[in-house]
Amino acid sequence: SGQGVLGPHVAEVLEVRERLAGLDDAAVADLRPLLAPDVTEERHLIPGAAEPTVILLRQGGGLGRTLQASTAVAALAGVADGELSVGQVASAVAALSELNAADAAALRAEMVEATRHLLTTGFLHPGK
């Protein structure tokens, strides 16, 4: 498990789960999440490769979870400072990746689903 007291972590996670239960995907896409301050990212690369073979998000507190993340989810975590909404991040990544409309919609759905998971496990905080 992570370091620190579990009570506040568990209470926050339960509160977030309850809040998310009432939100549809559009409302989740409008959230402006914040990365929890204890989360770190680890990348495994083959020398000379442009893309990592594995990206891990590690929780230093709470339950000390480790999650494998896609490049898109790692990008979301990397910019989760409360300024941009999940939908804005998805649109920016889709534009930078030059995705067609169907792939952009799939990316948005992936980020919304990942946001739900990252919020309910304490990797992200709801923000605004």
Predicted regions and their residues:
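Rossmann-like AdoMet/SAM-dependent catalytic core
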Residues: S1-Q68, A72, A77
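Long, charge-rich, low-complexity alpha-helical segments
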Residues: G61-K128
